[in-house]
Amino acid sequence: ARAGNRTLTDRDPTAHAEILALREAARALGSERLTGCDLYVTLEPCTMCAAAISFARIRRLYFGALDPKGGAVDSGVRFFAAPTCHHAPEVYPAVGETRAATLLRAFFKARR
């Protein structure tokens, strides 16, 4: 499944790329449990997305750029390390970090 951030176009604060991709994958596979699936994202997931990744039982999470301001995996609350987190995927941070930073700069420039 593929998705991009649609919070503005959908007027939906939950329409982050991760959430949309998880929804699409769950529909395609016919299950809310995505146990054999890996997720690749450009930016470190926020708390909401990290929780959804945990609930979906994603096997591996790869992300390009750290997000010290809003990230919740290696930054901020470090959701997967919390005792209330029932499933933590294998996490691979800073995968393609330079390319991710370029994509993010273009995305936020177009958004402004």
For each of these PLM feature ranges, what is it?
Residues 11, 15, 33, 71-73, ...:
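Non-catalytic, surface-exposed connector residues within folded enzymatic/regulatory domains
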Residues 16, 34-36, 56-58:
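Short connector loops at helix/strand junctions that flank enzyme active sites
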Residues 14, 42, 47:
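Ser/Thr-centric signal marking residues that sit
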Residues 28:
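Conserved catalytic cysteine-centered active-site region
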Residues 1-4:
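Short hydrophobic alpha-helix segments
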Residues 6-20, 24:
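A short, polar/charged loop-to-alpha-helix boundary motif
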Residues 45-112:
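Zinc-dependent deaminase
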Residues 31-43:
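Immediate flanking context of iron-sulfur cluster ligation sites
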